[in-house]
Design a protein with these regions (language model features):
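Walker B catalytic acidic pair
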Residues: 121-122
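Alpha-helical sensor/transducer elements of the RecA-like P-loop NTPase core
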Residues: 3-7, 16-20, 45-48, 77, ...
Length: 468
């Protein structure tokens, strides 16, 4: 029992994070602080570091929760034991008929000059029980004598609206907990690895700053690549991807395994990309209520959030997207990407449509989406150029049709291969007559774009035209 009343011991990679410790110290002057993020985000480590730093506005009482604590009697027995341990024993008295001492505790705390800081780790395990309602009662009736700090993977269901109205709730979420470049570099240093600046940035892009991902990468780099890091013949990508298998295992065990099968199925169906529009989620899952299901899943797990700029959109962690991709069968993946591509094409999202269709290995349709969407130029310029080029670099050189040929030419131009570009442009021109009249204008523009690119590449427009 007593082990539940102590923060877990710090591991080798425990990192002091002054920016977040200061934020917690400030937040804890309010009545409720919610630290909400998925597994491995560093919630417990942060709270332990904060308590150790001594920046606590009150007497701290820590309780690590598990599923058995959903029972109110069990939960409050640990809280009372924690209070007793720091010399704040609640006077004995008549226990409420419900079997919980929450009313007695509120009365005992009310008016204390020094507040009690009740820290509950894994508070999401309380969701669906009576405990959140009782905690809400305690927070309201103990007044300023109680400060609640809840670490949770999802919404702990403490009723926050009434507290938000008076500004007494602070949220610290996954984006806040994400590692900065300086913090990632320090984690690597704890494992004896000195990565380059670009390597650190690559790790953060790949992990989204997720603390467990950064730590596993540093550990894998130290164990598998040698403590010297990339400076000893290991490139940045080798370091950034060193822990891919370990990260997948962690996510499988800590993130997906605890979820009901229906939730995992929904994530697998819609998690093709990081940003999932609500209508696309409905299309891919076949569930009219997919939006609401994703909202509920986000509240319970913090695995996805509403996109900031577009209300009808959910954002999923890139690590989770990669894990889900690895779990799908090839056939299932192609079906989902083809359906997503068709949906995007119908909504004039040409680049997204092309990427989905190419991922489904439906090359003629992928090329058609680029050409008919007047998006061939995006292979060489624009925010999607790198992603498009990576996808279309796998396009077979003999893909059928004029649209495929002109896209292959544009890919070759982007890669600096004038010979292949000229060959594919010539093939596209030979097939022009096979294109329906209503698509001829889009193809002509694509030919002009690829031809101009070839001319710039060769440095001689006349020579480029002759090569065609």
């Amino acid at each position: 029992m007593m082990s539940k009343l102590d923060p877990p011991e710090a591991g080798r990679s425990a990192l002091s994070r002054p920016r977040l410790i200061d934020r917690l110290a400030s937040a804890a002057h309010g009545q409720i602080t919610l630290v909400t993020a998925p597994a491995g985000a560093g919630k417990t480590t942060l709270l332990r570091s904060w308590l150790a730093a001594g920046q606590v506005p009150g007497v701290p009482v820590w309780v690590s929760l598990d599923a058995a604590d959903r029972d109110p009697g069990t939960f409050w027995s640990y809280v009372l034991a924690g209070l007793d341990r720091v010399g704040l024993a609640v006077p004995s008295g008549e226990i409420e008929p419900a079997g919980t001492p929450v009313h007695l505790l509120a009365a005992a705390l009310y008016g204390r000059a020094e507040p009690v800081l009740l820290v509950l780790d894994d508070a999401d395990l309380l969701a669906g029980s009576e405990v959140p309602e009782e905690l809400d009662f305690l927070a309201r009736h103990a007044g300023s004598a109680l400060r609640l700090v809840l670490a949770s993977r999802g919404d702990p269901q403490v009723h926050r609206l009434r507290h938000r109205l008076d500004g007494s709730v602070t949220d610290i979420r996954a984006d806040d907990l994400a590692a900065t470049e300086a913090e990632a570099r320090e984690i690597f240093a704890l494992h004896g690895v000195t990565p380059s600046d670009e390597c650190v940035r690559a790790v953060l892009r790949r992990t989204g700053g997720w603390m467990a991902g950064v730590t596993l990468t540093a550990l894998a780099a130290a164990e598998r690549l040698g403590a010297a890091g990339p400076g000893r013949g290991h490139d940045d990508r080798a370091v950034a991807t060193a822990a891919d298998a370990d990260i997948a295992d962690y996510l499988d065990a800590e993130v997906l395994a605890p979820l009901p099968p229906a939730d995992v199925q929904l994530l697998s169906q819609v998690g093709l990309v990081e940003h999932v529009p609500g209508a696309l989620a409905v299309e891919l899952s076949g569930r009219p209520a997919a939006r609401q299901a994703l909202d509920d899943l986000g509240r319970r797990t913090s695995l996805l959030q509403r996109c900031r700029r577009h209300e009808d959109c959910h954002r999923m962690d890139p690590l989770l997207v990669r894990l889900l991709a690895g779990r799908r069968s090839a056939g299932s993946s192609r079906r989902l990407h083809r359906r997503a591509g068709e949906w995007c094409a119908a909504g004039d999202r040409s680049v997204d449509a092309a990427i989905h269709l190419a991922t489904a290995l439906d090359w003629p349709e992928a090329a058609s989406a680029l050409v008919n969407g007047y998006a061939v130029a995006h292979l060489s310029a624009g925010p999607q150029a790198r992603r498009l080029l990576a996808v279309f670099s796998g396009m077979p050189p003999d893909s059928r049709g004029a649209q495929s040929a002109v896209v292959l030419a544009a890919v070759a131009v982007a890669r600096g291969d004038a010979e292949v570009a000229a060959k594919q442009l010539g093939r596209a021109e030979e097939l022009v007559d096979d294109v329906p009249p209503d698509r001829a204008g889009a193809l002509a523009l694509a030919l002009a774009v690829a031809g101009a690119g070839l001319a710039r590449l060769s440095g001689d427009a006349d020579r480029a035209m002759e090569a065609r």
